[in-house]
């Protein structure tokens, strides 16, 4: 995949789009630095030099994780952010391999390099990188959804390595840019940022690229479902015209917000979706009800069925890419969390299905992490991720759920 060029228009706007309008008083938010040149190519967090991690950041992380109460808002928020990354990192090992049911091979982060990008255990792909861009955009803009800022961060990821897993592995560059998002970014560059909402594709362009990155939205707006769903929709529309894509983001936000608020995954959320969730896309309403669309077996979204499988027709057409359609990804993610009883079992089940396993794994991780929480994620998995993120993903989860403790909500 080629890297983008002719980004001078982006450089001229960086000062505006990457600088918060005000100062957040809380000490934890002061670990953000938008003035460092290093920030632009690596991380939102302050680093004095390459390979150096802020002592303040490490101290804050130690305090917040040691004082976390299981099933608390913070525990669930951090769990969802890390879940996104863990599902992505583990799922990459089998990404684009032909789908397989009921065969468990991978039960941990793996050993040695693996997957199509030959990643080390714990390194993530576009799913997490773009999810971190979304988180950073909300944090730096203090809860205001700024579509151009988000698109700029996506470009910085692909061109400069911002938010990728390789800040301590110079042999790698950003990886995983999908065809639909690539088209949207090229369009944005060609138009010099005039329209942040893509016209690439059409209203049926509904890949899984916006649900895979959605974790930050329900964490940030768990207190206000309507605002959360609104931001979920618009963050999808920057790269996907598809109605099903944005509606699946709304559904995912609805589910994760309820879980962060302490509702039970099975009794309060999944078994009540048919009565409590509705949107303006009929097919997604059918999916939420765990039903089939008429007599079309290839539009069967009955994820509550113990024997639920992907559409046989779509599997036969391209088995390795099954799950790349947002409806397939969402339905299978719900099936996996509905038929397992722990975060670990949910992740193991989804990544071993193969297909688009990193993106479907990312969605499973967001849901399972929000329900079971950070404290119920295997510590050995967390430590593998920490080798590459140095605890910054968890920090984002904590910061996002407390963002409006300090900042007045400003969302279009």
What positions do the PLM features span?
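Structured, active/binding-site neighborhoods that engage oxygen-rich ligands
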Residues: 2-412
């Amino acid at each position: 995949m080629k890297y983008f060029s002719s980004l001078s228009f982006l450089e001229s706007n960086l000062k505006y789009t990457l600088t918060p309008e005000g100062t957040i008083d809380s000490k934890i938010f002061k670990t953000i630095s938008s003035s460092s040149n290093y920030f632009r190519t690596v991380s939102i967090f302050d680093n004095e030099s390459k390979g150096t991690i802020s002592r303040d950041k490490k101290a804050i992380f130690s305090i917040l994780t040691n004082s976390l109460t299981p099933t608390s808002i913070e525990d669930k928020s951090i769990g969802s952010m890390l879940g996104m990354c863990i599902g992505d990192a583990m799922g990459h090992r089998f990404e684009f391999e032909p789908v397989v049911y009921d065969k468990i091979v991978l039960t941990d982060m793996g050993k040695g390099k693996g997957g199509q990008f030959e990643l080390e255990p714990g390194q993530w792909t576009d799913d997490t990188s773009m999810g971190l861009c979304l988180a950073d955009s909300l944090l730096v803009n203090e809860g205001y959804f700024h579509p151009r800022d988000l698109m700029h961060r996506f470009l910085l990821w692909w061109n400069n390595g911002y938010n990728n897993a390789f800040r301590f592995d110079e042999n790698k560059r950003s990886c995983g840019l999908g065809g639909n998002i690539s088209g949207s970014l090229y369009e944005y560059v060609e138009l010099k940022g005039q329209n942040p909402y893509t016209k690439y594709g059409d209203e049926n362009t509904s890949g899984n690229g916006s649900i895979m990155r959605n974790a930050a939205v329900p964490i940030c707006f768990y207190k206000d479902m309507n605002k959360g769903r609104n931001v979920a929709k618009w963050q999808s529309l920057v790269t996907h015209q598809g109605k099903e894509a944005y509606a699946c983001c709304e559904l995912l936000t609805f589910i994760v917000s309820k879980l962060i608020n302490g509702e039970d995954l099975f009794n309060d959320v999944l078994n009540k979706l048919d009565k409590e969730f509705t949107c303006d896309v009929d097919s997604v309403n059918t999916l939420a009800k765990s039903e089939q669309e008429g007599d079309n077996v290839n539009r069967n979204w009955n994820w509550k069925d113990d024997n639920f499988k992907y559409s046989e027709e779509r599997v036969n057409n391209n088995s390795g890419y099954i799950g790349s359609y947002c409806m397939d990804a969402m339905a299978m993610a719900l099936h996996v969390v509905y038929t397992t009883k722990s975060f670990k079992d949910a992740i193991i089940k989804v990544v071993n299905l193969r297909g688009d396993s990193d993106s479907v794994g990312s969605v499973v991780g967001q849901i399972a992490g929000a329900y079971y929480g950070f404290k119920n994620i295997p510590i050995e998995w967390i430590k593998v991720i920490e080798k590459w993120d140095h605890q910054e993903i968890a920090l984002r989860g904590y910061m996002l759920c407390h963002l409006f403790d300090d900042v007045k909500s400003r969302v279009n």
